[in-house]
């Protein structure tokens, strides 16, 4: 597994498109979420994702600085492609680590 952490301006168009496809498949199609999937918060986020050994997306999370969607740093859009194998836990652990180390977060809101 490879962990990738990129800010919006570091993502290629292909990477961002792939992340949006995954998010839409899970949150809009599968979970029928009524919330807008593409928003301006993406531009402020650190996008974290795991790729498996074949290069496919295995997990994703979006980490936001304080003041973007909440008064505190926040973690949202969490996806584990394969469920029941610990990827959700791994991506959350990494998201918390990034929020603490990169954003100096003492308090983190989970969306």
Regions found by a protein language model. Name each.
Residues 30, 66-68:
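Conserved, charge-rich beta-strand/loop surface module that forms ligand/interface-binding patches
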Residues 99-111:
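Conserved GNAT acetyl-CoA-binding A-motif
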Residues 1-35, 39-44, 51-56:
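Short amphipathic alpha-helix that is part of the acyltransferase structural core
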